[in-house]
Structures are given as C-alpha cells and as structure tokens.
Amino acid sequence: MKKLLTCIALGFATTSYAVTPLWMRDVQISPDGTEIAFCYKGDIYKVPAKGGTATQLTTQASYECTPIWSPDGKQIAFASDRNGNFDLFVMPSNGGTAQCLTTHSASEIPSAFTPDGKYVLFSASIQDPAQSALFPTSAMTELYKVPIGGGRTEQVLGTPAEMVCFDKSGKTFLYQDRKGFEDEWRKHHTSSVTRDIWMYDTQTGKHTNLTDHAGEDRNAVFTPDGQTVYFLSERNGGSFNVYSFPLNTPQSITAVTKFKTHPVRFLSTSSDNTLCYTYDGEIYTQRPGVNPQKVRIDLIRDDQEQISDLNSSKGATSATVSPDGKQIALTLRGEVFVTSADYNTTKQITNTPAAETGVCFSPDNRTLAYASERGGNWQLYLAKIARKEEANFPNATIIEEEVLLPSKTVERNYPQFSPDGKELAFIEDRMRLMVVNLETKKVRQVTDGSTWYSTAGGFDYSWSPDGKWFTLRFIGNKHDPYSDIGLVSAQGGEITNLTNSGYTSTSPQWVLDGNAILFTTERYGMRAHASWGSLNDAMLVFMNQDAYDKFRLSKEDYELQKELEKEQKEVAGDKTNDKKKEDKADEKKDEKPKDIVVELKGIQDRILRLTPNSSEMGSAVISKNGETLYYFSAFEDKYDLWKMDLRKKETKLLHKMNTGWANMEMDKEGKNLFLLGSNSMQKMDMGSEKLTPIHYQANLKMDLAAEREYMFDHVYKQEQKRFYNCLLYTSDAADD
C-alpha cells in the first residue's frame, strides 16, 4: 500500500513540475544547429534542436535574458540585472560560473560574438560621439565591444546598431537601425521611423542600406555562405514573417514563411542553414524548402508562484482624510488601507489582485466608498465598520464589504458621499456624473457626458456643503482639452460655465461655507500651447454678491463688520436664554447646513485672482475662517508650502518642504491641515502652523502572478474601450 501511495505521489509531482513552456523569448540556435538557447521567466535555458528536456543554465533570482552563442558553441553571453542594472555576462554553454564583463550603470544588451570569438558586441547608451546629432536619450544606443575575458570596452559605432550578425570573415556585419522612440513590440507600424536592415563594412566604415520599406524590417541574419540574408518583416500587409534576399540584389525579396495572425520573432540561423524562430510563443526550426517544425520542449521547473510580502511606509498613490481628522484612507499598490492620523496603526481593507481607487469617507467616518476593477469592470464598493463599539477602521476587527449597483458592463468610479451621507455621487462610464440614493438604490443623472471627452477615467467634482449643487471641471464649447469650472444642480440640469477663460481651469472646491469656489487656472500665467509649461494661479468665484462684498472689505472694515455681527449674535442670544432648551432632534436640525445662496446673474464679475504671481502650483486650500490661503508651489526645485493672508495680501514661505506633489485637505472643523503625498504625509495644526509627520505601515501579501494576469486584462480592456474603434481599424483587436 505504501509503495502504491509513493508511486501516486511521484506521478503527481511529475505532472506538477513538468511543464510545456509558452512565450519563450530571445531564442537563438547554436552555430552547429544542435541546440537552442532561450529565455523563460527570467532564466536562460537550452534544449536540443530536435526537442526534448530543457536544461536550466541560470538560477539567480535576478532576470537573465538575450543569450548569444560563441562561434565554437562553447560559451553563451547574456544580460543580467543581478548587480542592479543589466550587465554583460559570459558562461560555459553547459552551465557553470558566469563572469561579468561590464560594470557601467547603463543597460548593456549583447548582440553577437565576433567571428574569432574574442569579443562580444553589445548595445548600450554610454557616450555619444562628440559629432553626434542624435537626441541624447538612452533609447538611442551605441554599439560597443568587450573582450570575453573582460577588459576595456571599445565603441564600434556611435549610432544605434541592434541585432548584429557577422559574416564568416568578420569584415562586414548586418544590423537593424533605430530612428525613433516607437515601441519595438508595436504591430503593423508604418512610418518613417520603422527599422531597416543595414550592412556595415568594418574595413571602410561604409554603411549600406539593404531595405527601404515604410514598415518594419529587422533581425537580419546571414546564410552560412554569406550570400543570402534572412530577416523579419511585416511586408504585404501581414504580421512578421521570415523573408530573404540575395545580398547582391536586396530588392529581390522572397517570402520564406507565411504565418498568419501572430508575428514571427527572434530569428537566428546555424552553420547548416537551419532557421530558428518563435511563433505564438513557441519555438520552430525550418530547413530550406521544408515546412516549419515545432520544437517540443519539456521543462522541469517549480512553477508555483510564491506569495510575496510588501512592508511599506511610503508610496501611496492617493490619500484622503476622514471628516473628524482622525483617520487617513490611502491606496497603495492598488489596495485600500486606513491608518491613524496620530499613530502608525494601519488596517488593510482590500486584498485583491485588481486595482482599487478613488477611496473616500462617509460623513460619520465609519464607511468607505471606492471603486475596484474586480471581475473585469470598474464597480463601486462600500466597506463598513461592523461593530458599533469600534470607533475607527485602523482598530476595527470586522469590516463588511458590499458591492454597490453591480454590473458587468457599466463602469462606475470616483465616488463621493453627499454631506448628509445619504447619497453617493460617482462618474459613470468615465464621462457622466451620477448620484445614487444609498437607501433606495435609485440612480439619477446629473450630467449627460457631453461635456467631457477624455476616456482616462474621470474629472474633478465636489458636492456643495448643502448637498444641492456640484462644482465640476468640464469642457465648454467642445474646447477639449481646455477645461472650465462649472456649476450644476445636484438634481441635474444645465451646467453653468463659471470661468469661460479659453484656458485650462481645474481643481474646483467649495470654500467660505459654500459661498465661493476655489480653483486653479493658467489664464494669467504661461499657457500649455505646446502641451506643457503651464503656470497657474489660485482664483475664487463667489456664489452671491454679499459674500463677494464681504471678502473685499479692507482689514479695518472687516474687523468692524465682525464686531457688529458679534453684537447682533449676543443680542439674539439674550432673547433665547429665557426659552427652554431645545431637544436633541432640534439640535440636529440646527446643525443642518444652511442653503447656499446662488446668484447666477453677474457671477462672472465676481471672480478674483488670489495669488500675486503665477507659478507651478500644486494643491491649495483656504482656512475655515476664510482668512488664509495655503498652497503648494515650486519655484526652485520641488514643492514648498506657501501662505497668503487674504486681507493683508501678504505672501510668505511657510515651510520649505522640497517635496513632490501632495494633496491638501482639512478636517471638517478646520483645525488641522493634512499634507498627503506619496513619499510623506504630515499634519499641520492650523493654530500653531506646526508640522507633525504621519506614519503608516502597510503590510500586505502579494500574489504576483495574479497581479500580472490582472494587469494584462486591464491593458487589454483599456485598449478596447479607449483606443480601438472598429470603424477606424480594419484588423481585429482581439486577434492583435
């Protein structure tokens, strides 16, 4: 019985670890045509050219790729990032210790051995020649060589020369050029920057163009006699296939393979004229005049993906503070966390391979709303503290999650609770502003999507304190991408354009108890006429004349106004002292925000510029009492925190922070200002203006394989929804 169980266990182990690999990369056949080297999941393998069990040659945790055979087949050069960046290594072709040949901080990718086997040629962006007219970028590499025993690196060519293949004499070699920045994996690309095949004479320094085609021609190799060239091309309107031409008449091109749908990649040839390449993730060999043969590969490998741990105290992609100022919700690596504003206690709310985004708090601080792309579609989720005796998320023991308005087709994202917490606004299908009643689940449309053209995901919007209005960023008069600030009823209707500037205005938020909207605009600074370089100002648009007049009072007049209002309140208070205390229901009723007075007539005449000069602005807020503007601005390097007294019109540098972009939010009472950045978070007491760091510790377990699967699906769906249009493209996106 024990023997039987042992046999069953061994059989199970065999089926668990023996795999038929797919999507092998950087395939190259050995010079004698007996073996094939390739990269699979970041390691170098070799397999008999007739098929069989693959042998693993590298076992480092780093990424190894681009194996290149030496002319005698005894060594393999490859690239590895085991030292941080990709360096060049060489090792025995039967396995063994790898020797590092290069140590430059650039990434070095091998192309070929010289025919005498003494040097390895590689591409890297190290040093442009003094006479070079190329744009200085790492994408435009130079060609170098290094002795196989290590030593001084020499520049062969100062221009991009990739996928080198020597003839037997070593006097000439083929290469593919690179003229631009287009992604090398793009299919069906036709333009002036597509790659061409060239031949270089090492004796005379002459470059000869062998192909002049508007599409891609690349990865050229010589036949053993050096009289014919094989290469990959997307000619004839199809995918990459193998073509050939005589070296003396390169215009006489013949198709060698006729694969459809998928591209042929990674072409190489051996001394017996055997071609080797990949198609649809598998390896093929082909002899002249014979049909391609798939190489059967068995690969023994422990393919069980390990769960990885991530412990991070920075790197949040977004963050928001709870109304009471005691909790901060953040997203990090696509997961939602909540941390204490005063301690580093941090709770993970979600744990999925899919991305979560747009997290926000309910007014009672006990519910989170966010969007998640689980199941392949952006949907809204609510996470609630289950136990009434537990006051916050970081210390909660049970958190209940539910999907809101489940759908497999309609996308919903960027939620925001209404001020009373009874409704939730969100953006539907990336363009429409919608509201759902959380009790009845009834949905109403606020905007119809005709005023937003970007499919990137959403736009800025904000509830008014009384819950009856939205301010939002929108495109007026079809003037995309230049946005204006709008005002629309929370019940839906026509959007009122508050700015009409013709230049980009963004980031609207309600201030001064809802009597004004703060926003930033480039109307006075440098404008993005060439898609970059904007300088912005902070502006206010006032909802009513009374608020506008009060804001423009001098400091002296404003102080007199405050004294008068104080006396009026005291008189009103004396009259109510004789009355009985109101019950709790009445107290709650009194706490309800007052309706905002919106006077649309003349509203465009009630717009004020706050900042004294245009600058590279970040986030901005106005204090609860309306006296001070706080904003991020970058004058020297990164962002610093600035303060402006709105009565005195005085501006000063409050804190020299030299930080990246950060969001600024106040708690509901206006007692603390939160500076929420990716690399650091801080809290500023509004009285003392002292900064206190906020620490969090996000600990999560990552299923990297599941994350990669999600990322692939995400990109595929992005292409379907944001790029592909069957009316514009003749190819099937699902096949491409």
Task: Indicate residue ranges for each PLM-predicted region.
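A flexible loop/linker signature enriched in serine peptidases of the S9 family
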Residues: 19-21, 39-45, 58-64, 77-89, ...
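Conserved small/polar residues in nucleotide/adenosyl-binding loops
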Residues: 729-735
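Blade-terminus and WD-like Trp-Asp/Gly-His loop motifs, strongest in beta-propeller folds
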Residues: 28-33, 67-75, 111-119, 164-172, ...
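Predominantly a core beta-strand signature of beta-propeller blades
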Residues: 53-54, 96-99, 151-154, 196, ...
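Beta-strand-rich domains and repeat architectures in extracellular enzymes and scaffolds
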Residues: 19-45, 316-334, 611-627
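Long hydrophobic segments that form regular secondary structure
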Residues: 606, 612-649
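Conserved blade-ending motifs and adjacent loop-strand segments that build the rim/top face
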Residues: 254-266, 496-507, 618, 655-664
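A short helix->beta-strand "capping" segment at the edge of beta-propeller domains
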Residues: 19-24, 54, 301-313, 397-402, ...
